[in-house]
């Protein structure tokens, strides 16, 4: 396999907050077992909220530990962008084959280690990459996920794409094996696959996960459901009132969506802070990010709507033609659109729709109360931020939910 180049970027901390955003216990938490922090992120999305927005004191939201992990990785990945120099008994060298082996004129003191932020990372500058490709693959996955979170000041960015060609037979067969699995289980599967060994963009499993992410997105919008499936597949929200986070892949031999008139791909993120306590949103993003970690992004992101620190990053963001503007949505207005689409399709009655809307609003309100309390309990000045800072008005920010749902209709006509 030819050597592949990976470009990434690390997070930036709040300008009002003293760096770093973590403490020594956070570091111990992510290095407490083998292979950590690489390929351990899946354990952070196994928590089920069952509509109760609680977790732990140190990581008070579903997304909290991922945020901390991203910050730690980003702050200490200077070596990924500049190489590592080893020193022993008066000799210095790089990598396992001792490139640049030389005796220095004098033994220099160890350099001062300064955690960095907003660092551009390039695997071409990392001497271990070519020699340890299998080991670097899991690093690439986690750093890619870190980048998709680092480029956003709201929810993490993720890409959804749907081709004009029908779903391949091998993909259909592969998806059959996942019927009955929840979005969280499927995100874990995608994460483990993408980080185990070097994969290709055209591999059957990569294609399967790409379709799976698209089916999840269509189901989230309420456009894909049991009466309008993607080759028979859809996600069923079996407990929309009790646990809106619970969605399971199912199959139904009924009406199926036609291929889109043209290949579709868009970039999305959640606008409101609710995503930090929603297992389904975190899992859905990681599922889609596991695909782009292997296959690469279809196009660069447009600067519009992105924070200043995420603009004009080579190979990622810019204002040129062909870049994609990230579209945002609010989970509350998205749930209302989903219920409306169910009602229009005859899946539920108008009375049930109103009931589900109210239940989801209550669920979101509980999350708002919880996150607001956690923000107050963890002020920026403390130097450790286990949740992403937000403004009270952010909860009501609708974003472009209607436009996002319209995208889903074009993807799955």
Swiss-Prot record:
Highest taxon above the source species: Viruses
A Pfam family of this chain: Sigma_1_2
Coiled-coil annotated residue ranges, if any: none
Localization annotation: Virion
Matching InterPro entries: Sigma_1_2_reovir (IPR004317)
Keywords: Capsid protein, Intermediate capsid protein, Virion
Role noted for this protein: Located at the interface of the incomplete T=13 outer capsid and the pseudo T=2 inner capsid, 120 VP6 subunits clamp and stabilize the inner capsid shell.
UniProt subunit comment: Interacts with capsid proteins VP3, VP4 and VP7.
Name under which the protein is recorded: Clamp protein VP6
Organism name: Aquareovirus G (isolate American grass carp/USA/PB01-155/-)
Taxonomic lineage: Viruses, Riboviria, Orthornavirae, Duplornaviricota, Resentoviricetes
């Amino acid at each position: 396999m030819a050597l592949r180049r990976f470009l990434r970027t690390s997070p930036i901390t709040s300008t009002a907050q003293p760096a770093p955003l973590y403490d020594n216990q956070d570091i111990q938490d992510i290095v407490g077992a083998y292979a950590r922090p690489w390929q351990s992120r899946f354990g952070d999305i196994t928590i089920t909220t069952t509509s109760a927005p609680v977790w732990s004191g140190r990581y008070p939201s579903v997304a909290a530990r991922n945020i901390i992990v991203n910050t730690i990785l980003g702050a200490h990945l200077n070596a990924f962008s500049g190489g590592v120099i080893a020193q022993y008994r008066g000799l210095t060298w790089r990598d396992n084959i001792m490139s640049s082996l030389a005796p220095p004129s004098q033994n220099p003191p160890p350099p001062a280690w300064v955690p960095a932020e907003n660092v551009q990372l390039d695997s071409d500058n990392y001497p271990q990459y070519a020699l340890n490709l299998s080991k670097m693959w899991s690093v690439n996955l986690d750093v890619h996920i870190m980048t998709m979170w680092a480029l956003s000041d709201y929810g993490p960015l993720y890409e959804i794409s749907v081709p004009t060609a029908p779903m391949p037979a091998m993909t259909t067969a592969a998806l059959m094996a996942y019927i009955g699995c929840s979005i969280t289980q499927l995100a874990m599967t995608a994460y483990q696959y993408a980080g185990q060994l070097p994969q290709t963009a055209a591999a059957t499993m990569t294609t399967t996960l790409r379709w799976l992410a698209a089916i999840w997105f269509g189901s989230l919008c309420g456009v894909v459901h049991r009466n309008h499936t993607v080759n028979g597949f859809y996600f069923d929200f079996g407990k929309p009132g009790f646990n809106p986070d619970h969605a399971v892949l199912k199959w139904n031999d009924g009406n199926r969506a036609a291929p889109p008139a043209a290949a579709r791909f868009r970039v999305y993120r959640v606008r409101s802070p609710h995503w930090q306590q929603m297992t389904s949103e975190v899992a859905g993003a990681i599922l889609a990010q596991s695909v782009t970690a292997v296959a690469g992004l279809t196009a660069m992101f447009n600067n519009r709507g992105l924070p200043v620190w995420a603009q004009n990053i080579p190979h990622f963001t810019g204002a040129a033609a062909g870049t994609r503007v990230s579209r945002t949505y609010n989970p509350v207005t998205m749930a209302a659109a989903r219920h409306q689409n169910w009602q229009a399709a005859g899946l539920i009655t108008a009375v049930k729709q109103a009931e589900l809307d109210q239940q989801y609003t209550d669920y979101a309100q509980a999350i708002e109360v919880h996150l607001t309390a956690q923000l107050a309990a963890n002020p920026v000045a403390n130097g450790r931020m286990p949740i992403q800072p937000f403004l009270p008005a952010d909860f009501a920010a609708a974003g472009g939910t209607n436009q996002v749902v319209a995208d889903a209709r074009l993807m799955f006509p």
